[in-house]
């Protein structure tokens, strides 16, 4: 089953936290970038780079602190108001610097634009990963997060694919 299908199943499951607005949020990401810079051609490489860094950071957290800690990070960062300190906590300062540099290299966006965009982008992506969070049982596995972390595909491929499918799904 594809990760997008797992997300759709979680959105349809009343025991899970996801909603259709979580999918809409991902499809509308381009609107968060400053005018003229938010085309799909910039979103795809941003998600490609971010997905790889997210998958690595969350896998590392899951291995060192356990699945509940990784789930809690996803839940915490799915909330509005994520700041630079939260991103430093997730990626480490050097990881965050590398993430910004790699996005800048792939998109041509300057680092200030990227730094302003990431605190808006991370909650949208994390909200999507949190769609499989069980509403009443915090210990229940999150099939979306587990699918993201356990996939043989890179995190970047997964997020880019979900973005494309979400955009197609919402155009129907």
How would you name each of these model-derived features?
Residues 1-172:
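A structural "flexibility-hinge" signal
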